[in-house]
Structure formats: structure tokens, C-alpha cells
Amino acid sequence: MELGNQPGPGNRPEIELEWYQYVQNTVGWALASYGWYILFGCIILYFLIQKLSANFTRAGASTHTTVTDPDEIVRRQEAVTAARMRMQEELNAQAELYKQKQVQLQEEKRRRNIETWDRMQEGKSSKVACRLGQDASPSTSASSSPSTSSSAPKPKPERKPLRGSGYNPLTGDGGSTCAWRPGRRGPSSGGUG
């Protein structure tokens, strides 16, 4: 039996030495090639962990405060209910005003129709009454009597004509930039007519 051929306790440091050299070479090569990337990656990872842990603790704390404070929940619900009632009262008041205006408009319309009917029965024109009834405000039309409404209508004010007296679109006179052209013969290209 020869002790030199078998691995024994004396050969073990040699294997460990080779292993340490292998690890040192591999790690040294990785750090030499990617050292800065590894360093910045570790720094970014550290800050991400800090940020996420702070967010999780904040979120957990906020959920516990809302659940554990029933008095605050009751106060919020009462405030919401009071706001809803206030808004409903405002809406009801607006609806009441709208109904009153509609009733007034219906009364005014009914009164105008009665006046028109009375005028037609007397043989007077209904168009004058309609124009007078529409132009007059409810306070003045209620105080007007049949004698004042039978007066002649107001004369129209003098208006300046839009175009000169020599305007004729068929001749092209009149200062416009385009002259009249006759339309195409034949059916129109689609549409109604």
C-alpha cells in the first residue's frame, strides 16, 4: 500500500487552492467586465426596495385608520346626506318656479286666444291683435282696452335698400364678381329633384 497514490489529507489543500484560484479568476473576470453594471444595479435595487416598502407601509396604515374610526364614517355619511337634502330642496324650488312660469305662460296664451276670438267675432283682423299681443308685455296688454288695440299699426321705418336700383342679376350688372350662368340641362345628379 502506497500512500502517495491515494488522496489523503495532504492533497486536500492543493484542491482547495485550485478551487480558490478558479473562483477568483471567474469572479475577477466578471467584476472586471461587468463591475459598473453590477454596482449600479445594486444601487437601483436598493432604492427600489426602500421606495416600495415605504409605499406598502403607508398603504397599510391608511387602510387601518379608515376602518378603525367609526365616528368619522358617521360624520361623513351625515354630511353627504345633508348635502343631498340641500341639493334636493334647491331642485324642488327651481321646479316650483318653472311650474309657476309655465302656468303664467299658459294664462297669457289663453288670454291672447280669447282676445283673438273676440276680435274675429267683431269682424276685426286677428293678425293685428296677434302682433299687438306678442309685442306688448303682459302688464301693458292686460291694461289695454279694445279701443286702443283697434288703432292703426305703427308705420315701418324707412330702410335703405340693400342693392342699388340698377341691380339685375341676369345681366351681370351690380358690381358682383361673378355673373349669372344658366343651369345645366338634364336631370340633377342625385338628391331629391
Swiss-Prot record:
Pfam families: Selenoprotein_S. The keyword S-adenosyl-L-methionine does not apply. One of its GO terms (cellular component) is Derlin-1 retrotranslocation complex. It is found in: Endoplasmic reticulum membrane; Cytoplasm. Its main location: endoplasmic reticulum. It comes from the Eukaryota. GO terms for biological process: endoplasmic reticulum unfolded protein response; retrograde protein transport, ER to cytosol. The chain crosses the membrane at residues 29-49. Residues 114-125 have a biased composition (Basic and acidic residues). It is a single-pass membrane protein. Residues 114-193 are annotated as: Disordered. Involved in the degradation process of misfolded endoplasmic reticulum (ER) luminal proteins. Participates in the transfer of misfolded proteins from the ER to the cytosol, where they are destroyed by the proteasome in a ubiquitin-dependent manner. Belongs to the selenoprotein S family. This is Selenoprotein S A.
